């Protein structure tokens, strides 16, 4: 009947990208558009003569919960929450972290209460709290977190928990590389949560055993721990 379709407009949109010399295109689609991917990928190959690679990432739905109950949205009734509303409620950092904290092919339950509570169950708080604890040590010692720390290699010793933390830290470059190559950003918050868990566990050991505390009268040991914290 002459009515424009989404497909026609999208072909023109992708053609414009190709004309701007992009050789890889990425589309992020909702789960309800999963069946659309083959058509647009085929169209992109045709108009680019197979020169351009179009990757379609299908994201599952985000379910919102308030006070433990599902928040049912309806455009017709005017009951809905925008991204702007979400950011105002919990903050942009929490919103970004939680949205990335699941693979795109897995549904996400976004609980307002959980995202704002101060507990291990809130990954945003748990990771930020690790950073806050590290900074508190440097403030207490009146040291600049970015300053170089002098140490004696011969006196540089590590216990099993410190070795475990350093092993995890050494995985960071590889984690970033895989996340980029596979287009899987959820690997980043997963990694940060695991690293924060190791740090908090080690911190808690110091409550009962002074040899595990980050600040002590043993200067070589304290220096070793400060270097780990800088990492």
Role assignments for model-derived ranges:
Residues 1-231:
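Non-catalytic interaction-recognition regions
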């Amino acid at each position: 009947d002459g009515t424009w379709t989404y497909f026609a407009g999208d072909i023109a949109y992708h053609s414009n990208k190709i004309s701007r010399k992009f050789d890889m295109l990425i589309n992020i689609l909702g789960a309800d558009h999963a069946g659309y991917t083959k058509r647009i990928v085929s169209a992109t190959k045709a108009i680019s003569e197979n020169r351009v690679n179009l990757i379609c990432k299908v994201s599952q739905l985000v379910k919102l919960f308030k006070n433990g109950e599902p928040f049912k949205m309806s455009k017709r009734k005017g009951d809905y929450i925008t991204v702007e509303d979400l950011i105002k409620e919990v903050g942009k950092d929490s919103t970004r972290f939680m949205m990335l904290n699941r693979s795109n092919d897995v549904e996400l339950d976004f609980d307002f209460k959980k995202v704002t509570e101060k507990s291990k169950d809130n990954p945003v708080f748990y990771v930020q709290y690790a950073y806050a604890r590290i900074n508190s040590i440097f403030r207490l010692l009146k040291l600049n977190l970015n300053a170089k720390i002098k140490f004696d290699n011969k006196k540089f010793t590590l216990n099993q928990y410190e070795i475990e933390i350093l092993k995890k830290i050494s995985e960071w470059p590889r984690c970033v590389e895989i996340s980029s190559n596979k287009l899987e950003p959820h690997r980043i918050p997963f990694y940060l949560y695991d690293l924060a868990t190791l740090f908090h566990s080690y911190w808690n050991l110091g409550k009962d055993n002074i040899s595990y505390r980050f600040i002590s009268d043993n200067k070589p040991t304290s220096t070793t721990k400060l270097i780990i914290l800088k990492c």
